[in-house]
Amino acid sequence: MAAGVSLVSDLPYSTSRESNTDMETVNVRVPTAKYTKVGETLRHVIPGHMQCSMACGGRACKYENPSRWSDKEQAVKGLYSSWITDHLLAMARPSTEIVEKFNIIEQFHVCGLKTVINLQRPGEHASCGSTLEPESGFTYRPELFMEAGIYFYNFGWKDYGVASLTTILDMVKVMSFAMQEGKIAVHCHAGLGRTGVLIACFLVFTSRMSADQAILFVRAKRPNSIQTRGQLLCVREFAQFLVPLRSVFSCAEPKAHEVTLSQYLTRQRHLLHGYEARHMKNMPKIIHLICRLLLDIAENRQTVEEEVLEIPDLTEEVEKTVSLQALQQLGKEMRGKGIPISSPRSPDQPNLLGTPCDPPHDQPLCSDQEFDVLWRWPTVDNTYRSRLILSKCFSYSDSALHKLDPRVHVLQSPQNLSSKSGLNFSELYASQSRLALETPDLLPSDIKSSPKHDLLTGSRSSLVQSKKIEEQVSCPPASVKQAPLKVAKRSMSYGFLGRTNDSSTMFSICQVGRSTNKNSNCDVTQHFKDVPILTLQSELSPETRHLFVAKALTVDLDGEELRSKVSVWQMELNSREGAWERLCNERDPVVLSLLMWSWLEQLKEPVITKDDVETLSGNRLNPEHALNSLDKGQKQTLLCILDCAAHLLKIPEEVENAFFERLIKAFTWISSDSENGQLIYKALKDVMVPVLRDLRTKAMEELEFTCHCSFVP
C-alpha cells in the first residue's frame, strides 16, 4: 500500500564496505524510502481498519477503483497495473467484481499472462475495497484463474514487512520457473511495496543488476514502488546474499572466501532448483558440465534439434523497455545520488573477453558514454542475450520437460581473445596444436599423406570458407549481428549444452607446409586467407578423438597462454551472466580439462584429505566399499570424472597412468615425487583402477546396445 506521503532522504549511503576498482563510488544520497520514519512507525501500531480508512479510502480504496487511474496507469484495463518488463506485470489486487466486470481473465490471455503471484496473507486489508471471499480470504477466488489455465502462487508476506533472504531466493526461483510458461503478474495490496521488492530482487537475481539499479528501474516503471527503509534494505541485502553463492572460483575476481567441497555444494543447492537441483545434489555443476562437454568433443556428437516455443530473455527486455530518454534520466539520477556505476573502459585497457569490433547493435549510445547505461553487458551479444533465459541453467517446468532436453542451444560466444590481450589469431588454438604435434598417431594415415595435411588445430568457433578467414581475424563471429530467430532450438545431444554448427568441429587442417621453426605460426596466419579449410569431423576416427581428449586430461597448467585462457574463464564464471552457456561453446579439451582441475585445486581443502587416503588405503581390496566410505559429494565428484574417462573406452596404458597421476594430484594436492607420494598414489590407484574398468565395461555395453538398436528395422 502507498499513501500520499512526503519524500524524504535517508542518511548518505556509503559503499565503502566494498572496494571495486571498476566502480565509481560517491558518498551521496541513494534511493530513499517513500515514508518518513514516523510514518513507518505509525503503520506498525495503528490498527489495520484505521490505516485503510486514512491511507487509501477504506471501502472506496483508490487502488481497487479503476476510475481513480488513467489509462496509462492501467496496463490491464480495470486494474492499477504497470509493465515492469515485457513479461513482468505489477498490479494492485484484483477482486471478483473487477475480474468479471472488466473481463480480466480474457485480458490476461490476450497479454500472454500465464501466472499470478499473490503476496498477501488471507484476511489482509479486510476493510479495503471489495469484501473478502470467505473461501480464500482474498478479494477473489484463485480458482477463477486456475480454471482458466492460469497458474497461481501465494507467498504470504506481511504488509510493510520484509521476507527472509532464503524465502525471497525461493520466490525468485519459482518466478524463473514460471516465466518459462509465459508472462507473470505479481500483486500484493497496492502492488507497490512487497511487489516492488520481489520484482527488484528478481531483476538482481536474473540480470545481476545492483540493488540500487534494480530499485530505480522498478520505480521508473511503477512510481512509489519499494516504500519502506526495511524494503530498501531487503533488496540490498539480497544482492549481497547472492555474491558468495555465485562465486565458482574463490581465487578469481571477484574474490570470495575459500570453501570446501561440502560448503560449495550447500551454496550450489541454494541457486539450483528443478532438474539441476535433483541431478546435481551431490555434484559440482562445473565438474558435471565439463565432463559432458569433453565427452561431446570425444564423440563429435551431432545435435538433433527440436523446434520449441521461444522463451523470452529478461535482460533483453530491460534494455528494450527503457527508451533513450529514460536511460538518460536514470543515468543522471543515479550519478546525482551516488549510485556506483561502472566506469567506461579506457582505450588502452584490455578487454579479455570482448571483441575487437562491436556490432552496430552493441555500439555504445551517446548516452552510454556519458552515463554508462546500467544494464549494458559489453561482452554479451544482444542476440545471444535474447536466449539466455532459453538456455538458463535454472530448470524447466514439468510441462516443458517432455519436449525439452535440459541441454540447450546457445549462440557462439565471444571467447576468442582479442589482440588487446596479447594473443593473436594463430595462438588461439596453440594448446591443441602442441598436443597434436606430440601425438603423431592422432591422424589416420590417409589424412597424414594428404597434401592438405599440415597443421592440427582445435576449432572452437564456427569454421567458414577461406574467403571469410580474414574477416574472422578482424572480427570474431560472435560479434557479428545474428538475425533474431522466430523459433528457438534446443539441443538433444546427450550432455552437450552448446551449439554445434554443421561446419564446426574440434579439428581443422590447413594447407600449409609443416614447419617446426618459430615462424610457422606467423606463416599460418599470413596465409590463412589463401588456405582452404577441411573439417575433420568425419575423417577422424572415434579412437583418435578419444585419445585426444584423454591426453588433454593429463595436461598440467603450464604456460602464460593457457593460464590466461583459464583465468578468463574463471572470472567469466564468477561475474558474467550467461557464462555457463558460453562455456558450452568452448571446444578446446585442454582448456576445459585445466579449468576442471583448477577448480578442484582452489578449494579450501583437498577433496580427498589425508584421513580419506588412509580410509581408502585400508579398504583398497574392496574398491566399492572404499568409495562408499567417502561422503556423497566426494564420491559423486570422483565418479563423474572416472565415468568421463571410462566413456573414452580403450586408451594406451601410459595415457591412462598419466590420467590417474593428474586425477590423484588434483584430488589430494599431493605430488607423486613428495614424501610417501608413490605409496599414496599406488594405494589410490588400487581403488580407482578397478572402478574405472567397471565403468568402462558398462560404457562399452551401452555402446553395443545403442549400436544394436540403431540397426533394428
Swiss-Prot record:
Q: Which residues form the Tyrosine-protein phosphatase domain?
A: 80-251
The reply on keyword Hydrolase is yes
Query: Carries keyword Hydrolase?
Result: yes
Supply the Gene3D superfamilies for this chain: Protein tyrosine phosphatase superfamily (3.90.190.10)
Listed GO cellular component terms? cytoplasm
Q: What is its EC number?
A: 3.1.3.-
Q: Name one GO molecular function term.
A: protein tyrosine phosphatase activity
Signal peptide (from-to) = none
One GO BP: cilium assembly
Which enzyme type, at the first EC level?
hydrolase
Kindly give the InterPro entries that the UniProt entry links to this protein.
Answer: Dual-sp_phosphatase_cat-dom, Prot-tyrosine_phosphatase-like, PTP, PTPDC1_PTP, Tyr_Pase_AS, Tyr_Pase_cat, Tyr_Pase_dom, TYR_PHOSPHATASE_DUAL_dom
Name the residues annotated as catalytic in the UniProt entry.
C188
Against CDD domains, the record matches this protein to:
PTP_PTPDC1
For this UniProt record, the keywords arranged alphabetically read as follows:
Cilium biogenesis/degradation, Hydrolase, Protein phosphatase
According to its UniProt record, which protein family does this protein belong to?
Answer: Belongs to the protein-tyrosine phosphatase family. Non-receptor class PTPDC1 subfamily.
| Its biological purpose | May play roles in cilia formation and/or maintenance.
Looking up PANTHER family in the UniProt record yields: TYROSINE SPECIFIC PROTEIN PHOSPHATASE AND DUAL SPECIFICITY PROTEIN PHOSPHATASE
> What is the protein's given name?
Protein tyrosine phosphatase domain-containing protein 1
Q: Whose protein is this, by species?
A: Danio rerio (Zebrafish)
